[in-house]
């Protein structure tokens, strides 16, 4: 890759490769979230035996496997980071793992048994997870000292592209599943992933390609400074993991709850899995609001650091999860509440996501030395993995042999709401004690 630029050009403007990365991310996120949006519905309604008969899962089992898959998606970034920073570089790692990703979608589209589900999700976990730290770190690599002031804004638009892809897919794939079955519903995301790979390949000559550090990368990770950095970050990420334990239940528990609600909203019948599209739509609306209005207004009165944003977001998450707790109480009493109440919960939870997730993404990149960017981004992804692993473990633990749950009804939501409240209070103390250092790429 000697014919590629290996350092950012001095420029106050937007790097030339950014549009290709954003376009790739939008298409890739369509494929991932479109597939993920229908997983619980597929496992509880469409899963087949090898003889073609129905072999659906109970709700607790489906939630357990769903969160185990999401956890795997966010554990595999460590593999991608090791390949990227230590051997192949970000660009080649993304291309290779994206092709594996496409094969996973193909497996889900053609085989609807538990074996096909396992193979498809395994390949997708390796591909989708492996490219995650590389893509987000690749964004930061395009910037130098003269345009680093645009980094925060571009990370916001990077997150915006994620949610544009997610919004469109979360409306489309549940409809495809309902009207055309799982073959087309899983096949369309596969086509979008292939398009995402091609878009990224087209931008190869516009990118800054930071060379892999090889053994230098390993030595830096295992050095005293590297281990101290990971130690500091691990404590922060442990608390953020609890946020993800709650947040990612929008794709499992919240979908199953929506099946028991009145689906008509403003005269439109909304499929239970489609209500998830509220989240990416709200993110696209709230990112500009927070970036250009809320944060500047608050900063004039109070210094709004990255960790303070995350702390506030955790308390907002407590409020957000209180709403489905109340909804479930109504359902337990025989009521059929409007799905509009879940929409309100999404407004509050998405506000928390903007404060926690986007800020943590930027925080992770700026805390990492040059040769550890992808590794630290992967380390951040571990917080999502740990959170989902916890939720999966809880669901498998509370599942009775007959498929029922030990934490039935509203008690399930009350448990997670209380857990988030305790976490938010303790995080205030941890954030006050954190001492870090900021790293930005040098220009040439």
Question: Which residues does each PLM region occupy?
Answer:
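Intracellular juxtamembrane helix-capping segments at the cytosolic ends
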Residues: 130-146, 353-368
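C-terminal ends and interior cores of transmembrane alpha-helices
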Residues: 96-117, 312-334
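Cytoplasmic membrane-interface "Motif A"-like loop-to-helix N-cap segments
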Residues: 86-98, 296-317
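Short amphipathic helix-loop junctions that connect adjacent transmembrane helices
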Residues: 37-63, 252-273
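Conserved MFS/SLC helix-loop-helix module at the cytosolic interface between two early adjacent transmembrane helices
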Residues: 76-100, 105-106
């Amino acid at each position: 890759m000697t014919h590629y630029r290996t350092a950012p050009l001095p420029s106050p403007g937007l790097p030339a490769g950014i549009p290709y990365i954003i376009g790739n991310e939008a298409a890739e996120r369509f494929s991932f979230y479109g597939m993920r949006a229908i997983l619980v519905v597929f496992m509880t309604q469409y899963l087949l035996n090898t003889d073609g008969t129905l072999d659906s899962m109970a709700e607790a089992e489906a939630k357990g496997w769903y969160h185990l898959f999401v956890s795997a998606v966010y554990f595999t970034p460590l593999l991608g980071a090791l390949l990227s920073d230590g051997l192949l570089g970000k660009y080649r790692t993304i291309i290779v793992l994206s092709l594996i990703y496409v094969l996973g979608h193909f497996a889900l589209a053609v085989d609807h048994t538990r074996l096909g589900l396992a193979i498809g999700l395994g390949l997708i976990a390796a591909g989708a997870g492996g490219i995650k730290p590389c893509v987000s770190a690749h964004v930061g690599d395009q910037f130098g000292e003269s345009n680093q002031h645009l980094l925060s804004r571009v990370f916001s638009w990077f997150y915006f592209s994620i949610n544009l892809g997610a919004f469109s897919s979360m409306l489309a794939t549940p409809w495809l599943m309902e009207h055309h079955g799982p073959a087309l519903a899983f096949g369309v995301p596969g086509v979008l992933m292939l398009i995402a790979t091609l878009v990224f390949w087209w931008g190869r000559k516009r990118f800054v390609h930071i060379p892999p550090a090889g053994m230098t990368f390993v030595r830096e990770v295992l050095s005293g400074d590297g281990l101290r950095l990971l130690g500091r970050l691990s404590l922060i990420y442990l608390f953020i993991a609890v946020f993800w334990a709650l947040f990612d239940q929008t794709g499992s528990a919240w979908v199953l709850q929506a099946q028991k609600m009145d689906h008509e909203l403003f005269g439109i019948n909304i499929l239970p899995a489609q209500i998830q599209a509220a989240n990416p739509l709200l993110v696209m609306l709230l990112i500009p609001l927070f970036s250009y209005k809320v944060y500047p207004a608050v900063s004039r009165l109070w210094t709004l650091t990255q960790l303070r944003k995350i702390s506030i977001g955790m308390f907002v998450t407590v409020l957000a999860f209180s709403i489905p707790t109340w909804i479930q109480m109504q359902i337990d009493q025989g009521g059929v509440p409007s799905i509009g109440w879940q929409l309100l919960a999404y407004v509050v939870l998405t506000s928390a996501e903007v404060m926690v997730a986007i800020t943590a993404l930027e925080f992770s990149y700026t805390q990492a030395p040059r040769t550890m960017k992808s590794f630290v981004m992967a380390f951040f992804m571990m917080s999502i993995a740990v959170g989902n692993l916890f939720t999966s473990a809880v669901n498998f633990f509370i599942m009775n042999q007959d498929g029922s749950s030990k934490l039935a009804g509203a008690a399930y939501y009350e448990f997670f709401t209380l857990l988030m409240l305790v976490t938010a209070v303790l995080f205030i103390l941890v954030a006050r004690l954190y001492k870090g250092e900021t790293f930005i790429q040098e220009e040439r």
